[in-house]
Amino acid sequence: DWQACADHGVLGSMVAGEFGGRDRSLASTLLTLEGLGHGCTDNGLTFAVASQILSTQLVLERFGTDAQQRRWLPGLVDGSLIGAFAMTELESGSDAFSLTATAEERPDGGYRLNGHKAYITFGPVCDLCVVFASTRPGAGAWGVSAFFVPTDLPGVHRGDVRSKMGMRTTPFGDLELADVDLPPESLIGRPGAGASIFSSIIDVERSFIFAPQVGAMQRQLEATIEFARTREQGGHPIARYQAVAHRIAAMKERHEAARLFLYRAALAEARGDRLTMAASLAKIVACDAGIASSMDAAVVNGARGYLPEFEVERQLRDAMGGLVYSGSTDVLRNVVARLLGVG
């Protein structure tokens, strides 16, 4: 469960030891998340762990002041606090910086925050939220700033947990922000730095958010092979039929491709390269691989693959979310095309 992930050091993998973390590299954390995905059958939990590590905590590690880090990182690492990352709004999704949430500067240097954030992982249960809002309405990306917002402040309302197709164990919902008064120290970086902060974090998140799913794909492949070897039809294990064997071979191909694209992104990050291309490709390949392989696993399992009491059906539902979160696959193909000079 969540607390077990904290107790075993997973949540603090990249956090400095002075805050209770393990001080490991992003590449090492990728391997940790992949192993977690292989060993844990709760894909919602593994996604939630990766989400907090690669968003809220990463913002604190890279952009937080010493005071901000000391206030929040120990609790996030030991599991006593939960962090969320609130960029999306009802009318602001792929067009990320078309925000209606505003943060008006007060005479004392603080800010008054108003707006509605939608579809937020951990939104209904978070203790701390990284909120993006416009401090210069009409200035687009250049007017966006980022804030650390404790959810126990007056005016912060956490919405109900929303039902969704997959990853149902991850709380997901909205945040209402009504005249929330923030002290000056809530600002992350400088005013107007929100777009650069978001772009830096989202490239890392896209690169590695599928690490648990790559581990889950390995588990899925192993289970499908075992089923195909033991399930007999026509006097033979179904693994001996070419149609079944080819589906399993394709699952292996996709798993290796997804893993290699994630590792390639990790190498790019370690070198200090710009991540946008590697991140986009890693997410596209891993997402498509997860969906296609889940469909193949469902077909090989026959009726079992269509029933909710078996893991196969849940894996397919869970995989579908990847088409949307951390940047839709279609939009990321536009990003790749633009970087190639054809979009």
Question: Where do the PLM segments sit?
Answer:
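Alpha-helical interface subdomain recognition
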Residues: D1-C40, V49, F63-Q68, G75, ...
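Helix-loop "lid/cap" segments that line or gate small-molecule binding pockets
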Residues: L54-F63
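A short, Trp-centered hydrophobic/proline-enriched beta-strand micro-motif
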Residues: D78-M87
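Short Gly/Pro-enriched turn/cap motifs at secondary-structure boundaries
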Residues: E91-S94, Y119-F122, R136-G138, K164-P171
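Flexible, small-/acidic-enriched active-site or ligand-binding loops
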Residues: S98, D152-P183
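A structural signal for short hydrophobic beta-strand segments in well-ordered beta-sheet cores
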Residues: A101-E104
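A short core secondary-structure module
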Residues: G110, N114-R158
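A short, charged helix-loop
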Residues: G173-S200
